Amino acid sequence: MQEQYRPEEIESKVQLHWDEKRTFEVTEDESKEKYYCLSMLPYPSGRLHMGHVRNYTIGDVIARYQRMLGKNVLQPIGWDAFGLPAEGAAVKNNTAPAPWTYDNIAYMKNQLKMLGFGYDWSRELATCTPEYYRWEQKFFTELYKKGLVYKKTSAVNWCPNDQTVLANEQVIDGCCWRCDTKVERKEIPQWFIKITAYADELLNNLDKLDHWPDTVKTMQRNWIGRSEGVEITFNVNDYDNTLTVYTTRPDTFMGCTYLAVAAGHPLAQKAAENNPELAAFIDECRNTKVAEAEMATMEKKGVDTGFKAVHPLTGEEIPVWAANFVLMEYGTGAVMAVPGHDQRDYEFASKYGLNIKPVILAADGSEPDLSQQALTEKGVLFNSGEFNGLDHEAAFNAIADKLTAMGVGERKVNYRLRDWGVSRQRYWGAPIPMVTLEDGTVMPTPDDQLPVILPEDVVMDGITSPIKADPEWAKTTVNGMPALRETDTFDTFMESSWYYARYTCPEYKEGMLDSKAANYWLPVDIYIGGIEHAIMHLLYFRFFHKLMRDAGMVNSDEPAKQLLCQGMVLADAFYYVGENGERNWVSPVDAIVERDEKGRIVKAKDAAGHELVYTGMSKMSKSKNNGIDPQVMVERYGADTVRLFMMFASPADMTLEWQESGVEGANRFLKRVWKLVYEHTAKGDVAALNVDALTEDQKALRRDVHKTIAKVTDDIGRRQTFNTAIAAIMELMNKLAKAPTDGEQDRALMQEALLAVIRMLNPFTPHICFTLWQELKGEGDIDNAPWPVADEKAMVEDSTLVVVQVNGKVRAKITVPVDATEEQVRERAGQEHLVAKYLDGVTVRKVIYVPGKLLNLVVG
């Protein structure tokens, strides 16, 4: 073998071998235990970033380890290929989204291969191909027939100048990103899937997911937001309809002093006919996009509609206000306000001088002080007529029962979760397979017209979707009648909700899934991806699995047994202030830094001499120009080094700080491994290891080898603390580098140790391990080698350290066999120079012996 470690030579050779041998292609095999290891599929943006590399390295380490345990391991990869960025890039580069996407896929596929990930490439899929999305379209038509799909109007961002719908990220400070026109909210008909029909199951099954992070489960619980309460109906004077509100606190009902409705509510619209101030307020609300996160912090505003509602229990008239914090799409578009016991209602009532009536006593039994804020804690009722003196639970039930008996209340379970709106007014997505006949009938596209293919050879004007701009595209005939196709496309979360199942049978032509293959591989054993997907993707992913189960395609309830959310990758960020006061971010690669004795950055400048401001470590991002290109690092150090650093620098679920000095350290370690194998093999053949003939030192070294195997196995397999596994291998390597290699058994032991080290490193650094395994004459390819097993006998401590004291003072530490008698220990202690010195010419009056630990000789 060559003396120097040259990753650029060995890595491409090993990758070619895997390709030619199709090493990682698998098929169902009932005789083997399966393991399905899946990383979230990438969006083909053009280049891999370090976040991808971290995600996929973790997955590859787990997959290769499970393979070495003898399991049938599926690790597939594909491309989440539809989406808005392709439209922007196509306009910018004067091309169409399809060629841009396919070029990116080809480029990124090479990057994945360059990193040595062991994927089954025969299962690769791209979600933008009709072969993939046809089954999603077919499934959608079946959900429609089951009553799980419906159409209703819903608000979108509308640019009146371009006459087009904008995604949230295309609205900048309330204006269109392209023409800067003020964006309006417009109601348009859209398709929805009834995820709410599965709300209870999605919530309850979270308890089955023992190996999902609690943070993700909590986020999903809160997102689904199940609550129990009462729906209450109010009569409104001079208004044709009643108003219905939902409350989780009926115990506070006697303190309800006003109602609030959304600006879009029919009551507000009616009142606005003769109220210009209200009409202007409704207009203002229509054009503010309100995300829930902003709701909490934005200024609460409202206008009195002039209508009065009648409190069903007191008969009092209470005002009805239109307010910007009530949304039509949530619940009934109306809420009851109890300003004494709800902080938002309190602030609104204080601002507009509305009545605040306390009905709950403070914890000490006194009347609450409402001069500064509402009392939101639960407590005992007062000021509430017949309900005075009841505690929260008793009052909840008594008031709910009374309202129900009067016919104006009903107990209800409510969810925060809303149905999934899957319509997008974009081009680069799967066409929604619905048609409208001439007579207005809406129906699913007939099976013989599926898939509805998205034309790829299009011209993008950057404004209107090509399939909306071309009136001919939508024309079709159904049952001999002219019909128009739906020109909206699916939300791209649709494709990523079921791809994991299609990987089990990517070539299947008879339907969405081949149940036999799907049920062999599913559920996924471990799913790896970022925590940012906790509610959207990971909820739709679970929902789709249940839909496929209820369609008879899969027989499990949940799609993935374990979820691992990898931490973000951080890097140093630097900027200098330009002439106009703007920040110019400089890549850490281009920063020349000075550090103090603790390694902290104290000064930095760039090649042009700008003094740089160092802002610390932050997430790698385009905006701060602090992304590190994985390709550059692989070309500089090799894929194995990059992979090793990624797994060693921090626990998988914590943030990782990119430090090139750490990468250099990983590289030095691999060079040491190479050097040790080189020096060992240069001495020629090795004799068989005879464990019965080993010296104490050799036994101790062998004990370290097998203890390391046991620790690494536990760290990777059970604890998934990959960084501590690598640290243990490094520690063993340090001992091996110092071990004697002269004797026959020294070299036999070194051979056993190196074969173990190479196999333990294999999941992390597969190229160098593949090569060194061959140099060590390991059996077959390392890809088919079994994981090393710790020898229990070798780990038994057959000697122990005994502390020897004379009159309570430590004079020596001696190594003795575990089964040595007290006499043997005394004899051995007497051979120590220092002990003998203190025993010379004196009488031993007493011996205190703690077996295997301590020998104290009391002399006088």
UniProtKB/Swiss-Prot annotation:
A motif ('HIGH' region) lies at residues 42-52. GO terms for biological process: leucyl-tRNA aminoacylation. It comes from the Bacteria. Pfam families: Anticodon_1, tRNA-synt_1, tRNA-synt_1_2, tRNA-synt_1g. Keywords: Aminoacyl-tRNA synthetase, ATP-binding, Cytoplasm, Ligase, Nucleotide-binding, Protein biosynthesis. ATP binds at K622. CDD domains: Anticodon_Ia_Leu_BEm (cd07958), LeuRS_core (cd00812). InterPro entries: aa-tRNA-synth_I_CS, aa-tRNA-synth_Ia, Leu-tRNA-ligase, Leu_tRNA-synth_edit, M/V/L/I-tRNA-synth_anticd-bd, Methionyl/Leucyl_tRNA_Synth, Rossmann-like_a/b/a_fold, tRNAsynth_Ia_anticodon-bd. The keyword Ligase applies. It catalyses: tRNA(Leu) + L-leucine + ATP = L-leucyl-tRNA(Leu) + AMP + diphosphate. One of its GO terms (cellular component) is cytosol. Its main location: cytoplasm. Gene3D superfamilies: 2.20.28.290, 3.10.20.590, HUPs, Isoleucyl-tRNA Synthetase, Domain 1. It is found in: Cytoplasm. Belongs to the class-I aminoacyl-tRNA synthetase family. This is Leucine--tRNA ligase. The lineage of its organism: Bacteria, Pseudomonadati, Pseudomonadota, Gammaproteobacteria, Enterobacterales.
